[in-house]
Each structure stands twice: as C-alpha cells, then as structure tokens.
Amino acid sequence: EMCIRDRIHSVAGKLGKNTSLIAIRPFRSPHHTISQVAMVGGGASPQPGEISLAHNGVLFLDELPEFSRNVLEVLRQPLEDHRITISRAKYTLEYPANFQLIASMNPCPCGYYNHPTRHCVCHPGQVQRYLNKISGPLLDRIDIQVEIVPVPFEEISKSTPGESSASIRERVIQARQIQAQRFAGQAGIYSNAQMTPSLLHRYAQPDAAGLELLRHAMHRLNLSARAYDRILKVSRTIADLENSTDIRPEHLAEAISYRNLDRENWAG
C-alpha cells in the first residue's frame, strides 16, 4: 500500500528526493474551484489528480455544491471502479483511485433551510437549484448521508461525558478484525464495502423481518438497486460494530436512516 502511494506521489512530482516511504494514509481536501483535470488527472504532461493522490485514503470535499457540476459528475465512475482511465488523442492512462469520499454542505445558500430557530432567507427556487447541483447518481453512491442539526445549549453544557474517541476507535478496530477474518480467503477484499454480489448474498442476508423492512423502505423512498446493496453493506458493518453475527432489523433500520438525503426527500 505504501509503495503504491509513493509511486503515485512520485509521478505527480510530490515526493522529495530524500523522502522515505509515506507511512500515513492520505487526506486530500481540494478547494471547490478545482478543475476537472486537477481532480481526475491528465493534462499536457499527464499527472495523477486528487482522486489518485487520495488512493487508499480520504478525499474530503467541503461545500460540495460549490464544486463544478462537471467535476462532481466525473467522480461517479471512480467511486465504482476504484480507478480512473484517462483517454486522450496521444495517450491512454489508468491511475488507481480507491478513495473514501467524505463531503459536507449547507442545506441552502444561506445555511438555514429547515433550521429550528433561524429563518431561511432563500427563495424555494434557490434552494432547489442549490441542491440540484448534486445529481441523483452521485448521491446514490454515497453510503452514509447524515443531516446534522444544531446542538442545543443544554446538550453542550451537560456534564455527563459521551462515548470517548478511544472507545469508538477500539470498536472500529474490532470490527475491521472481524471483516479481515471473514474475507481471509478472498483476494483483494478486506472490508464489507468491497463485497461482491455473491459475498453480499453470503454474508449480508437479513431475516424475514429485515427483508420486509427493506422492501417497505425501497418502495417508500424509491431507492435504487445500488442503494439496496449499499444498505446491506452498511447494515453488515453496523452488526460487526455490535459484534453481532446476524443482521437484525434494527441494524437495517439504522442503515436505511442514513439514506435521508436521497432525491425523494430533498428540498421538502
């Protein structure tokens, strides 16, 4: 993993002569004014783009709707294939691009749409145009979609501590160990997110009650087949975090709740 990361950074001219192996997974946070070429790679002198520099790491896009629509749409295929193929008149290149996409955004241009106490000053058309910058197919590829609400003063000032980051980290490590054991005989597969359809059928099948819950959600939210697979993968991970062998209905319900930005619910 480190060798591949070093090769990518070397080709991009971002590895110093006396630099040893990069031992930390990358975290890339490009500005929203980035061009399509800078994001995916290419150019007159071909170089890897941000999605390849984030290989085996995180690509963080702050203020997602502020990015160019073309830049966002070009992310769709790499999110599926974990690589990017760049074809030009003089060359065809393929770079690895197995990154974890994390994005943030405001609910509207002013930032107060659906706010419990502040008044949104945006016209409904402005809100819709703002949200429409994120296409349905791109949103479909985002496994966990969470709407953050303002934290009231009473919660901030509570003396009772919540779960510590160290405790959460320990649970995540244990879940990754469970997945490593599960896929020990599967070449190139190390986590639930990488499950093929056959592995999904083998390791992420809910019981009858869970299937009924999922069927209802699919019809109610008008979810796609891609969303169906991703809900199963997320619910399998939730079960792993609870050290549960089976996927229970509550695991599915939590995974379904993470689809709350799907197109049916946007802009009211």
Where are these regions (language model features)?
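Basic, amphipathic alpha-helical bundle interface domains used for macromolecular binding and assembly
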Residues: 45-46, 69-268
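Post-Walker A helix-loop "phosphate-sensing" segment adjacent to the P-loop in P-loop NTPases
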Residues: 7-16, 81-83
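Conserved alpha-helical scaffold flanking the Walker A/P-loop in AAA+ ATPase domains
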Residues: 21, 26, 37-59
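Walker B catalytic acidic pair
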Residues: 56, 62-63, 74
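Residues immediately C-terminal
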Residues: 59-60, 66-67, 153
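Inter-lobe coupling/hinge segments of SF2-like helicase ATPases
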Residues: 18-21, 71
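Short, small-residue-biased leader/transition segments that mark boundaries at the very start
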Residues: 1-4
